[in-house]
Amino acid sequence: FKEKVAIVMQGPIVTKDSFTYETLKIYRKRFPKISLILSTWNEYSKDELNKFKAINVEIIRNTKPDYSGISNINFQIESTKNGIFKAKELGFKYCLKTRTDQRIYRHDFILFFLSLLDIFKIENKNLRKRLIIASLNTYKYRLYGVSDMLMFGHIDDMFKYWNVSFDKRVLKDVEMGVSALEYSKACICEVYLCTEFLKKINYCISFT
């Protein structure tokens, strides 16, 4: 494919079976010309990260936010946002956001994602393209709770989604109720990310 694509992998490095490293090795072998960005934490030494640099992985060593947020949402925001910003800074047009504990085995997944964006056009002046997300962890009755595990799209749309303020609320102060609707309206975690994004593109959030 001719488009400039970056893969942003965010989160703590999974050292068991060298999972994160081996995943990036697979991506590097499969896609020698794309950018691989590992957005992780500054708790790892430069020596620990040298093997990633040896396979031409761009490393971002982030400082963890003072407050992790509910279910570590602020950690995810920080590492993802900074990784996507680096891809944007380097001039990449498209970006895949994935996690350090996940691996995609399909050999042509980048081309598949690009084809989906080309086939399914979007008419929204506030977005360049659609955003592709995984069905895994996307639930029918959790309104606006799209999965945050994997996302692919135009770099501008991706940055718009993840360039969000930290959620400073603590769980004990959040009224979540007992129904799926009440939980959704609490706007925590995935719902927080999605609803904040929808506000930016002037979408009416109705919880219906």
Roles of regions detected by a PLM:
Residues 1-18:
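N-proximal low-complexity "stem/linker" segments adjacent to membrane-targeting elements
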Residues 39-90:
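Active-site-proximal specificity loops/subdomain of glycosyltransferases
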Residues 12-17, 43-44, 102-105, 157-159:
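Short acidic, S/G/P-rich loop/turn micro-motifs used as interaction or catalytic elements
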Residues 92-103:
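Short beta-strand-to-loop acidic/aromatic patch adjacent to the donor-nucleotide binding site
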Residues 18-21, 47-50, 71, 105-111, ...:
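A short acidic (Asp/Glu
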Residues 14-29:
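Short, well-formed alpha-helical segments that are part of the catalytic scaffolds
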Residues 3-5, 28-38, 57:
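Short loop->beta transition adjacent to catalytic acidic/histidine clusters or analogous donor-positioning motifs
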Residues 104-110, 114-208:
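Catalytic core and acceptor-binding pocket of nucleotide-sugar-dependent glycosyltransferases
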